[in-house]
């Protein structure tokens, strides 16, 4: 369980650390919103990239709270806590992949997401498939 919590905390704080480092190298104006045709509809400040890592940290603490709460519901053992921690690890991995994708788009000021070889939908649905396999085997 200790090893899983180390992985959990690493995945929880890694995006914040990476974005804080990348902030110095990002252009002042980055694409902040895309429409359904993958075209930029709004440009924003580079500091807007901090929003998603902060949400990731808050989500991580929420999952830790749920793990503690669920462990109290179980009389003996820690299966509920284990499931919550693993679900949190899988979810945080998805968040990290999304943040990496968005940072790549921000660094290159990509105006059309269709020009990136790996589509965000392919990435997320592929990772969701792997997540379902992992969660189904707990």
What residue spans do the PLM features occupy?
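Feature 926 captures the class I aminoacyl-tRNA synthetase adenylation module centered on the KMSKS loop
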Residues: 2-30, 34-138
């Amino acid at each position: 369980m200790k090893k899983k919590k180390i992985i959990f905390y690493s995945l929880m704080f890694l995006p914040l650390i990476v974005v804080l480092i990348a902030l110095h190298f990002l252009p002042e104006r980055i694409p902040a919103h895309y429409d359904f045709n993958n075209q930029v509809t709004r440009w924003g400040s580079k500091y807007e990239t901090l929003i998603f890592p902060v949400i990731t940290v808050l989500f991580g603490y929420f999952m830790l709270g749920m793990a503690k709460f669920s462990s109290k519901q179980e009389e003996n053992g820690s299966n509920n806590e284990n499931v919550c921690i693993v679900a949190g690890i899988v979810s945080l991995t998805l968040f990290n992949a999304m943040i990496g994708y968005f940072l790549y788009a921000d660094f290159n000021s990509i105006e059309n997401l269709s020009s990136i070889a790996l589509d965000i939908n392919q990435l997320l649905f592929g990772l969701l498939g792997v997540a379902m396999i992992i969660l189904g085997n707990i």
